[in-house]
C-alpha cells in the first residue's frame, strides 16, 4: 500500500517521539550496540580520560544507561530554556540543584578543580550552562551577570539562533548579519569579570568575530562543525575557528544530525570524525573538543522541544524524512555510531582508527576544555 504524505509524516513523527521522548529498550539497545566491538585500547583510554561533554540537556536526578555508558567526567548542561526570562531561568537552576542533591553520583561544578575531583571520586560533574542570554537583565548587566555567576552559571552565549540585545544569532545573519552590539561588548566584559565562559555556538558570523576580538580571555564554540564540510547556518567558517584558536579557545565537534549532513550522505560516526580531523588540521589538536548535543536523561524531553522537532520533520528535505524513506527506522533520529553521549567509547575507537595518539585523544576528550575553564572561571 502506498502511504500518503500525511501518513508518512505521522510515521516519522512517531519515530522521532520514540527516540527523543521515551526511554525505550529498542533505542537503548541500538545505541549501545555501536559500542560492542571497540578495541581494548579504546576502552582503556576512555576509562582513564577526563571526558567533558560541553553540550547536553534535560538532566534528571539519577544516573541512567546513557550516562553510565558515556564515562563522562563532566557535562555542560543547558539549564534555562533558550528564550527564558530571569524568573524561568531561576526555576531551572533550582531544578538542577535538586537533581544534583538527589543523586550521590552527581557533583556540582563551580571551579575547574571540581572536574578533576569528580574524576577521582567516580562522580559526574554538572556544569551549569545556557544556550541563550535573554534571562540577563539588560539594564544592569554587570550585577545581573554576577548574580547568575554566584548561582553557578559557568557557560553562556551572546545569542541563540536569532537576535538578542547582545548580537545576532546564526539564523538572523540570513537577513541582517549584524555585529556585536554595545550591550554585547559589556556582556562579554561582565562575563569575563564574573568567571563565565563565552560560548559562540548558535551565534552569527559577524557577531562571533566581533566577540572574539572583544574577548580578553579564551572564548569557545561548545558545539559547532566546519561549514567548509557541512554548509549549514549553525556551522562556523574557517576564519572563526582560526580566530577562536588564536585567543586560546576550543571548538567542540557536535553530533546533531542536521549540521553533519552534506545533503547526500546520512550523518554518522564517519562524518563526525571528518569534522574532527578537519578542525584538528586547521587549528590544531589543542583547540578541539566535543559537545555531543544530546539528552542526558533519555525520556526527559520537554513537550515544547518535542513539538519543535516534530515540526522540523515535516519536510521532504529533512534528514528524518529522507532517512525514513531509505528504510532506516530509528536511525532517522540519530547518527549511526554517535547517537548520544553514550557513544564516547566508540568515538575513541574511531579516533584511534584515524591515527590519533593517546595524548591527542585525551586533549580532545576533556583536557582542552579543562584548560579553558581554568583560564575563564574563578578558580
Please give the residue ranges for each predicted region.
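Active-site core of metal-dependent hydrolases
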Residues: 173-262
